[in-house]
Curated annotation (Swiss-Prot):
Source organism of the structure: Escherichia coli O17:K52:H18 (strain UMN026 / ExPEC)
Induction: Induced by L-ascorbate. Repressed by UlaR.
Catalytic activity: L-ribulose 5-phosphate = D-xylulose 5-phosphate
Record pathway: Cofactor degradation; L-ascorbate degradation; D-xylulose 5-phosphate from L-ascorbate: step 4/4
The protein's name: L-ribulose-5-phosphate 4-epimerase UlaF
Gene name of this polypeptide: ulaF
One family name in Pfam for this protein: Aldolase_II
Top-rank taxon: Bacteria
Keywords associated with the record: Carbohydrate metabolism, Isomerase, Metal-binding, Zinc
Chain sites annotated for binding substrate: 26-27, 43-44, 72-73
Residue sites binding Zn(2+) per the record: 74, 93, 95, 167
Residues the record marks as active site: 118, 225
Names of required cofactors: Zn(2+)
GO cellular component: cytosol
Length: 228
C-alpha cells in the first residue's frame, strides 16, 4: 500500500500546486480493486504538514484498516462512485473557484470550445439539489448517489467530472493523477466558459462535429493525439 499512499499524497499535493484548493478544501483518493481498499486524504490535515504516511486506507464499507487519522469527510461519496463505476481509478473533490461558481449557480459547464472537447464529451453536468431528508440522512453517500443519478448510463471517463449543485466539483480518472489532471482542466474550462459568456451572452455550444473530432482524436478507438 505504500506505493498507493505515495501516489495519493503526491496527487493531493498537486491540488494547492495548481491552485485548486484553499486551506484544506479538497481531497484525492485511489483504489486497489484487487484488495478492495481505498487510499484517501485524512480529514482536515493541512497540506503543509501532510506526509505520505498520513494517507488513510479504508475498505469498501468505509472502515479504516490503516492510518492514524480519520479519513476525508467525503469518503462515502468516493466509495459510492468506485462501487458504481469499475473504470474509475482515482477521484478528486475540490472547491475550485470557477467550477464551484457554476455549481452554486446550478448550471452545467457548457462545452463552448475545443479545450473543453479535448477532455469532456459534452457539457459538464450539474446535479439536482439534495432534499432536506438526503442532507440530514447519509449526506456524503447521497452526494455520490445524486452524481450517479445525473450521469445515468454514460461512460464516466467520457465525462470525467461533474458539479454538485450548491456544493462543488468532483472529477475522476484512470488513477489519482489522471483525476487531478481532469480537475485542473474542469477549473480552466469553467473559467473560459464564464469569460466567453460574459463577452458574448448569446454564445452557443461548440459545433458537434468539432467536439467529436477533438474528443475522439484523443480518446477514441483510433486516437492519434500524443505518442504511443
Amino acid at each position: 500500500m505504500q506505493k498507493l499512499k505515495q501516489q495519493v499524497f503526491e496527487a493531493n499535493m498537486d491540488l494547492p500546486r495548481y491552485g485548486l484548493v484553499t486551506f484544506t478544501w479538497g481531497n484525492v483518493s485511489t483504489i486497489d480493486r484487487e484488495r478492495g481498499l481505498v487510499v484517501i486524504k485524512p480529514s482536515g490535515v493541512a497540506y503543509e504538514t501532510m506526509k505520505a504516511d498520513d494517507m488513510v486506507v479504508v475498505d469498501m464499507s468505509g472502515k479504516v484498516v490503516e492510518g492514524e487519522y480519520r479519513p476525508s469527510s467525503d469518503t462515502a461519496t468516493h466509495l459510492e462512485l468506485y462501487r458504481r463505476y469499475p473504470s474509475l481509478g482515482g477521484i478528486v473533490h475540490t472547491h475550485s473557484t470557477h467550477a464551484t461558481a457554476w455549481a452554486q449557480a446550478g448550471l452545467a459547464i457548457p462545452a463552448l470550445g475545443t479545450t473543453h472537447a479535448d477532455y469532456f464529451f459534452g457539457d459538464i453536468p450539474c446535479t439536482r439539489g439534495l432534499s432536506e431528508e438526503e442532507v440530514q440522512g447519509e449526506y456524503e453517500l447521497n452526494t455520490g448517489k445524486v452524481i450517479i443519478e445525473t450521469l445515468g448510463n454514460a461512460e464516466p471517463l467520457h465525462t470525467p467530472g461533474i458539479v454538485v449543485y450548491q456544493h462543488g466539483p468532483f472529477a475522476w480518472g484512470k488513477d489519482a493523477h489522471d483525476a487531478v489532471h481532469n480537475a485542473v482542466v474542469m477549473e480552466e474550462v469553467a473559467k473560459m466558459a464564464w469569460i466567453a459568456r460574459g463577452i458574448n451572452p448569446q454564445l452557443n455550444h461548440i459545433d458537434s462535429y468539432l467536439m467529436n473530432k477533438h474528443f475522439m482524436r484523443k480518446h477514441g478507438p483510433n486516437a492519434y493525439y500524443g505518442q504511443k
